[in-house]
């Protein structure tokens, strides 16, 4: 696989170097994201389930952002749960606060354990890559906001 097809946010470089997997890979018009866990900066599972779920979604968000995408580009998520029925309500509240309508396809799978002790969920996602024109259109409002925020002095100097 070409290195250019891989997506690895700087914050996840350690995972790539230590565990030998990419955060995501581009394939045709899809971004296929590796599973994200709800761990803190120390690499340990976050104790509070809702905070852990939010951190796992934040990991997905970081991978999407590195590829120029956001949650509105997600087509499908698969979630792997330790204690699925015990934590499903809390997970759904977090999921619904993060994923916008129209909602992506979702499969939730109950499992006995994850790679990191104490982790309750791993979230993997598949997203639709944007065509270059769509990326430019998405960036346009940001560029317009930057131009509007420029000091009036510069605008006056250009008029002279």
What kind of region is each of these model predictions?
Residues 1-75, 81-160:
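N-terminal presequence-like segments and the immediate start of the first folded domain
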């Amino acid at each position: 696989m070409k290195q250019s097809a891989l997506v690895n946010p700087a914050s996840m470089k350690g995972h790539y170097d230590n565990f030998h997997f990419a955060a995501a890979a581009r394939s045709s018009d899809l971004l296929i994201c590796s599973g994200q866990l709800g761990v803190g900066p120390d690499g340990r599972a976050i104790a509070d389930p809702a905070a852990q779920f939010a951190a796992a979604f934040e990991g997905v968000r970081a991978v999407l952002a590195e590829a120029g995408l956001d949650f509105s580009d997600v087509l499908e998520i698969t979630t792997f749960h330790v204690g699925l029925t015990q934590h499903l309500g809390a997970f759904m509240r977090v999921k619904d606060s993060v994923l916008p309508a129209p909602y992506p396809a979702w499969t939730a799978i109950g499992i006995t354990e994850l790679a990191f002790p104490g982790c309750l969920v791993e979230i993997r996602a598949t997203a639709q890559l944007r065509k270059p024109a769509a990326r430019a259109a998405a960036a346009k409002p940001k560029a317009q906001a930057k131009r509007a925020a420029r000091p009036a002095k510069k605008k006056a100097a250009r008029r002279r």
